[in-house]
Amino acid sequence: MMMKFPDWKRLTPKFAAKELPRLLDAVETAVAAIEASEPKGFEYLVWRLDDATRPLWDLWGMVRHLSSVMNSAAWRRVEEDFQPRLVAFSLRVGQSRRLYDLAKRVLKKLGKDPKAATRRRILEKSIEGAEHCGVGLEGRKKERFNAVAARLAELGTKFANSVIDATKAFSLKKGGRTYTIDDANYPETMRECPDR
């Protein structure tokens, strides 16, 4: 497997805001196609689902990362605008009864073959994840679960932004000097050390 690194120069808030809706639509279509199919085995279900969703999760991971390290109003806006859709999509896939049933069927096909231990574990964890995501819930319980999950994601983002804001605002007055988070984190005398 070849490692693919992101094109950081191209990745701007404007690019992410344009690309995320396109990826969400493409991934939704791909997941619907997988749900409509019959599993031909582990590779067909697991790898196809992973291949379909990976571009979206990779971009979203970079958005979250850049939102925390660059933390501009533009990155925050992208994160706040798209987080509800990403949470809803994640819950929709996690609560897909069809994907859950397909995973159970493929797991059953694997049997007790010792060579398939890793594949069995991947499927077992996928099934467990769906159960923790509320695949068995219906009606008001499912609505409540989804509302709590969305609110939890929103609060997590607000908390992270508050920590970043508080860190940026930090200052310490000591010995007639004010230190901030942007100052070098070593004493002035260290600047003159030949082997620092």
What do these predicted regions represent?
Residues 1-196:
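Zn2+-dependent metallopeptidase catalytic domains
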